[in-house]
């Protein structure tokens, strides 16, 4: 596994690419990750993907809740929809914070 020193792009392969697919940096800008670091990246990919999938589902929760708030059938319904939207937003922010922590610890790529 290789990482671009210019933009951080991770490349899976035995050799670095001729140029970075993201930023176009030359092959020389890539550094090979040590096995332990590469293992951490590989291990974290599944969990990071789950976080991103959950984030998308929470976007749907917010959209449904907003529709329910707009529908305004009765106060109890609106209360539930508002609570759902608030909780979904908190969870989304928590996911962003968690992923940022993963990036700082090399658990991303």
Regions found by a protein language model. Give the residues of each.
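Residues immediately within or flanking Cys/His clusters that coordinate Zn2+
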Residues: 1, 17
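Short, flexible, mixed-charge glycine/proline-rich loop motifs
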Residues: 8-14
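Long, charge-rich boundary regions
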Residues: 33-94
């Amino acid at each position: 596994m290789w990482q671009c020193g210019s933009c951080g792009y991770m490349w899976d392969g035995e050799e670095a690419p001729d140029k970075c697919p993201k930023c176009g940096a030359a092959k020389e800008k890539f550094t090979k990750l040590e096995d332990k670091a590469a293992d951490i990246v590989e291990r974290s990919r599944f969990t990071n993907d789950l976080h991103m999938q959950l984030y998308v589902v929470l976007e749907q929760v917010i959209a449904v809740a907003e529709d329910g708030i707009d529908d305004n059938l009765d106060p109890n319904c609106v209360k539930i929809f508002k609570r759902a939207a608030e909780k979904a937003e908190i969870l989304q922010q928590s996911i962003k914070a968690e992923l940022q922590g993963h990036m700082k610890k090399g658990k991303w790529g």
